[in-house]
Amino acid sequence: MRLNNDCVRDILLSVEEVCDFNESFRYSKFSNDFERLQPYSHDEIIYHIKQCELAGLITSMFGADGGDYLEVGDLTPEGHKFL
């Protein structure tokens, strides 16, 4: 899959909006409530979240149910710089 920087940016902006000291970003294939992520397929979102983790842009990625559910702790300093 080709890396889409717009998708990466939309994911990071969505994570930034949701996350705080007590709240993490939760994405589910079955209930994508994030307006910024609506233009992207589930596979695109999962791929780009994993790329964000590999690039050190997000912390604490957790996946379950074969990738149908993902949880992200927050942005890293590099994630904030990217934005």
Write out the residue ranges for each language-model feature.
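Short, amphipathic alpha-helical interaction segments positioned at domain boundaries
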Residues: 67-83
